[in-house]
Amino acid sequence: MTTDLTDRRRLILKLAIQEFIESSQPVASDLLVRKYRLNVSPATVRNELAALEELGYLTHLHTSAGRVPTDAGYRYFVENLMDRTPLSATEQRTIRHQFYQVRSELDQWIQLAGAVLARTAQNASVVTPPRAQQARLKHLELIAIHETTALMVLVLHDGTIRQQTLTLDVAMTQEELSRCAAQINERCCDAPVERIEEVLKQERAQEPPGGNALVCQVLDLVVKAMHQFNEHISSDIHSDGLIEILNQPEFSRVERVRRMVEILQSGRALGTLIPRALSSSGVQVVIGGEHSYDEMREYSVVLSRYGGGEIVGVLGVIGPTRMAYPRAISAVRYISAVMSDLLAELYGIEGANRLNSEP
């Protein structure tokens, strides 16, 4: 929605959304006039609230005369109205100190990021470990075990090692296996899975019919392993902060608590958002009905990638659409910058979200 609003309507919409975020109660015109000392009458504010409702930014509950924001209202607020306030200097120092105390322990980074995000944003948090954005083949070895059995050792660009036993159609010597591995390494080194699929297709089209059977068999297993790795990137999600989100009034009903626990534990719906964050720069905000999964349409997610180059991860917060967006965005932005700096300093990875570039 791109409707231009008058300055007065922008102010009233901003105040109405801020008030609802703070109180969780529908917002009435007389409250806005009294609390924010507006130089207009409650009747005038009431008319403006009605106009904003007609435009789709607000709605009202049948049991109350007050208004509440719609997803479109929250979107307009995030993009045009909210105050962008960074975390305080004290908070930044504390967070940075906590991370540098555990900077040599990657697993502790992930746990700490989840805990700090949840506490700072007062919502649940999600974090994925830093990984290659997409699996690339670094090296392949084939090791003879028995005449018709071999071990495939697959090394990916980020150092991940996959091993799998192959049952061969015919007996093979170590020399023959090594030649096959060398051929694949020459053609597929540093290649993503899409390129290896092309090589497999080309090999199958060669003479004799089906090409080199061993090469095709190995390439097929490589493709499957790399697809599994890429899928794992989107599903390896650490979550924290359930206790924080349960303090929100939206979770007074058991059924809603159950749905949130399922979202955090299964990772299926959240996993669909990870590729979007990995391929985007800056902080991404997905609000309510903008989600493709129905079970996510009562929630908002604030995400950012961290790291840089080939090695990146994603972190963010999830909560009800009545989220303190400025606070959540500031927390996600700052912590992603801290983790990018850690990756850059400790592993020689140039961070995309550096602290010195934060606005």
Curated annotation (Swiss-Prot):
GO terms for biological process: negative regulation of DNA-templated transcription. Keywords: Repressor, Stress response, Transcription, Transcription regulation. SUPFAM superfamilies: GAF domain-like, Winged helix' DNA-binding domain. InterPro entries: GAF-like_dom_sf, HrcA, HrcA_C, WH-like_DNA-bd_sf, WH_DNA-bd_sf, WHTH_transcript_rep_HrcA_IDD. The keyword rRNA processing does not apply. The keyword Ubl conjugation does not apply. GO terms for molecular function: DNA binding. It holds the Pfam family HrcA. PANTHER family: HEAT-INDUCIBLE TRANSCRIPTION REPRESSOR HRCA. Belongs to the HrcA family. Negative regulator of class I heat shock genes (grpE-dnaK-dnaJ and groELS operons). Prevents heat-shock induction of these operons. HAMAP family: HrcA (MF_00081). This is Heat-inducible transcription repressor HrcA.
